[in-house]
């Protein structure tokens, strides 16, 4: 299997399966001298881990990270960083009924055709459990970006199924199980998700991700444009079916006089571009939206076929998220961080000596 490595200078290679002994990643290209501990990484893993509320999978995993290499006396050495997360709560017997049949909406059918074999236990490598390794790597990237530029990356859920969530303040995000920037709608969301779960069905979600204090100049036109790489990173997350940068699809109904962000000596007058022009960061906040499909694993019987092509009916057993988007915020933050650190290092490698005479107006209001 190819395609398990992300990045060009700051590279991350993930490994492991949902019901294997463990999973993890190798980070190569991390600058030396970054103070790093397991606690720095654990914070984001705890935000992502399963079993934290009745609205997510009840699989109980500590997701305790171990740093195996690349850190000495509390600082990165510049050598590869190996991170390991052991699986402790597998329940593989729940998946016996899909050993020879394909779950609708899952990667079972495509993995079988591509590789001629598959680990059917919890989806194996195709499981969203793999994203724990990305969150671990992203925590390292976030720490470096914050110390280097003051970059802050925040994600929150803006819609669950047909329920839109109003933004009331980022301080609310960590105070509820929905990663919602809103406390007044929590009871409504609790009731809604209880109904979804009781109906043996699932729903999708929409998330907003922002990166503040991003330096101007990141991105490598033409094929490695910053927005192109962000879209690539977000689409690599399980269940993501759509990505918007800035105004996104609303750009269709905007006029050019509205969409084009005007510049003044005091700063930009708007940010419909989402902080990226010509594939290069403007220094404004980078704004991304992602759409996540409903969880494919549901207890409602559905039609499918077995490996011989015979018709079957499957009801998925096991412990699953009725809305996988509820745990996606730390994953989306991690992927945006991995894009930004890689491009920051690429920019430094080629353009460290470039100095423009024009003021950086993105900083004029900060």
From Swiss-Prot:
Pfam families for this protein: Chorismate_synt
Source domain of life: Bacteria
Cofactors named for this entry: FMNH2
Residue positions binding NADP(+): 48, 54
EC number from the UniProt entry: 4.2.3.5
Protein's UniProt keywords contain tRNA-binding: no
Binding-site residues, FMN: 125-127, 238-239, 278, 293-297, 319
One GO cellular component term noted in the UniProt record for this chain: cytosol
GO terms assigned for molecular function: chorismate synthase activity; FMN binding
CDD domains: Chorismate_synthase
Cofactor: how bound: Reduced FMN (FMNH(2)).
Entry-linked HAMAP family: Chorismate_synth
Stated name of the protein: Chorismate synthase
Organism: Neisseria gonorrhoeae (strain NCCP11945)
